[in-house]
Structure formats: C-alpha cells, structure tokens
C-alpha cells in the first residue's frame, strides 16, 4: 500500500492553476488515540492484566483455567482487524461466563493511571504538528478520550500550544467502546463551535484510525484520511471508503499540504 498518492514529476511552477488541500487558516480535525498517541502497549497490558485477574479469581474458587496469553503481535493483529473481544477471549482459553468476567474487567483497567503512562507519542507527530503550525493550519482534536487525559499527554510532550482546541468525552470509558454515534456527536459539536467562533470549516478534513472517524467525517461531508498506524488495518479501513489511506500523521500532513493541479 502506498502512503501517499504519487504525483507527476512535472514542475508545478510551470502550471498555471495549483492549489492545496489544506491552506492557511483552515482546520484539520484529528482523532487522538492512534494518530497522535500509540496506545498499543496500554491495550495489550490491559488485556494481560484482565486475563491474569480472571485466572486468579477462578483459582480462588478452586477452578484452574487453561489460559493461553496471546503475544502482543497476535493481540494487536486481532484488534487491527476488528476481531471481537469475545473471540480474543476465546482464543486466550476462556469460555462461557469466564469470557463475561474477563470483559467486565477491561473498562476499569484500561484507564488506570499506571497504564495511561504507557501511551507513547507516535513517530513523526511533532514534525507534523510543526508543519501544520508553520503553514497556518489549525489542529482541532476530536476524541472519545477525556480532554484532561489528552491535555496531560500533550503537555508531557510539549505539544499543547500547537493544538487549537480539544473536544473530548466526560466519561473515561467512552474511548475503549469507540462507538460511531459518539464520534459523530463529538465532531458535530466541534464543527458547530468552530463555526460560532468564526472559523470556516468547509475546507476541513477529518483524520483518524477507525471506522468511527471515517463515518463521522462522512456524516458532515468532510473528506477523510484513514491512518494505519493505529488500531485498524489498511484492509479493514478501506472497507469504509475514506478519501485516502496513509501510514501515519506525518505522511497524512505531507499528502494534505502537497500542491494539486486545478483543472
């Protein structure tokens, strides 16, 4: 898969009409988990802790569970290809009520402070943010994570001043569920407020790493960029017909700031 649509080698300076997909003053709506934060370690360790706790709980009842812990590569492959959590639990050696017990532990674990600290900045994000800032393009984060969590993360990496606004959730458990209707509602609120503040969002794009991000952008007729560095694979994302698929935020910004020929 190519990250960016290949361009003609013809010098753009020799062509009369050229334009940019994103120009100075425009707004880029961007998801947080996946495009900006690498959450793979946190999600995998949440899985491991939930599996271990379930096994220990049954051991206290004198019941030995034949647990098979997946490797991180196996686990993340399943997550990227939208394998249900029930199937992941089944592959891990659980069945019946054991699966229910395992799944009930995840929401409480995934937002523990000790696990949140495992999130890492995706490669190339700092340069991508700087590129957008230097071009006068505003970054507005639309996420199902709590805004306070996002802001803490951005401060940790000295990136908070590069973001114009954060639209997040009040509920800490909303992000893991990643329901499309929630992302649509968040993006709708973000667009409405940006317009009230006097910013034109008609040329905006939506960038994200899940079907929820793509569907939200499409709901408001925004072109969408799907990133494969997060929790969904390229093959899965293409099924939702995004405008373009890129590897990460860095390649997405390159794509969005390249000149295109006006016909």
Regions from the language model: what does each represent?
Residues 16, 22-123:
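N-terminal helical cap/lid subdomain that shapes the substrate entry/recognition surface
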Residues 42, 120-124, 145, 209, ...:
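Short beta->alpha linker loops
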């Amino acid at each position: 898969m190519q990250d960016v649509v290949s361009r003609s080698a013809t010098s753009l300076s020799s062509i009369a009409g050229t334009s940019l997909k994103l120009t100075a003053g425009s707004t880029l709506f961007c998801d947080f988990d996946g495009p900006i934060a690498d959450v793979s370690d946190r999600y995998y360790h949440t899985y491991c802790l939930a599996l271990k706790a379930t096994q220990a709980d049954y051991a206290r009842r004198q019941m030995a569970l034949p647990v098979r812990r997946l490797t991180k590569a196996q686990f993340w492959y399943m997550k990227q290809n939208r394998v249900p959590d029930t199937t992941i639990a089944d592959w891990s050696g659980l069945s019946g009520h054991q699966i229910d017990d395992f799944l009930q532990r995840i929401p409480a674990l995934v937002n523990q402070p000790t696990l949140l600290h495992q999130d890492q900045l995706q490669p190339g994000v700092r340069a991508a943010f700087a590129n957008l800032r230097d071009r006068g393009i505003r970054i507005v984060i639309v996420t199902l994570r709590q805004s306070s969590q996002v802001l803490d993360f951005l401060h940790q990496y000295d990136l908070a001043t590069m973001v114009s606004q954060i639209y997040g959730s009040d509920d800490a458990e909303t992000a893991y569920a990643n329901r499309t209707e929630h992302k649509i509602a968040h993006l709708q609120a973000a667009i409405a407020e940006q317009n009230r503040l006097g910013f034109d969002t008609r040329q905006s794009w939506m960038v994200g790493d899940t079907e929820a991000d793509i569907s939200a952008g499409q709901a408001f007729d925004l072109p969408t960029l799907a990133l494969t560095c997060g929790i969904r694979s390229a093959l899965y994302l293409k099924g939702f017909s995004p405008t373009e698929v890129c590897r990460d935020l860095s390649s997405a910004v390159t794509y969005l700031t390249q000149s295109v020929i006006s016909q």
